[in-house]
Design a protein with these regions (language model features):
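Acidic, Ser/Thr- and proline-rich intrinsically disordered linker/docking segments
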Residues: 42-115
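Phosphoinositide-dependent membrane-docking surfaces
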Residues: 21-24, 30-48
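Alpha-helical transmembrane spans
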Residues: 3-4, 107-130
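Glycine-centered tight beta-turn/hairpin loop motif at sheet-sheet or coil-to-beta transitions
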Residues: 11, 29, 59-61
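Short, hydrophobic/aromatic-rich segments at coil-to-beta transitions
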Residues: 1-3, 20-23
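Anionic N-terminal interaction surfaces
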Residues: 1-15
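Short, exposed beta-strand/loop patches in secreted or surface proteins that constitute
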Residues: 14-18, 55-57
Length: 130
């Protein structure tokens, strides 16, 4: 499965390809392969009711932030919610048996009280999917 997003005009489009035992992050000419086994944490985030993010924290690597949007111009934002939701579900399917990742959610509406809540990869909280 492949998913492409672009959260801001300052960033190049990012494509993430899910394979059997790893994911590949493609940004411009750069490609990074990350085995599912080294992903330590997945954090699902929802803000403003329409913005969704999945943050992957690989062991020893930079966090990977995946969004449900693709910014085409300064005014135009393409909503990729359906593809994002499918991508997140397939990612969790791969991680459940191939990773020891912790899974949690954070709502950023109230930044003062941002307590992560844990969940099982087989029971993704629906309010964190578009």
């Amino acid at each position: 499965m492949e998913y492409t997003f672009r959260p801001s005009l300052d960033e190049q489009p990012t494509t993430i390809c899910l394979a059997e035992y790893n994911l590949t992050v493609k940004k411009g000419k750069q490609e990074t392969v990350i085995p599912y086994a080294v992903i330590n944490e997945v954090v699902l985030n929802k803000s403003n009711g329409k913005q969704f993010r999945a943050k992957l924290l690989p062991d020893g690597g930079k966090p990977i932030v995946i969004t449900n949007t693709y910014r085409t111009t300064s005014k135009d934002v393409e909503d990729r919610s359906r593809a994002y939701a499918t991508f997140v579900r397939v990612l969790h399917f791969h991680l459940k048996d191939k990773s020891k990742a912790k899974f949690s959610t954070i709502v950023t509406a109230l930044k003062l009280f941002r307590f992560p809540k844990s969940y099982l990869p087989t029971e993704i909280p629906l309010e964190f999917l578009p």
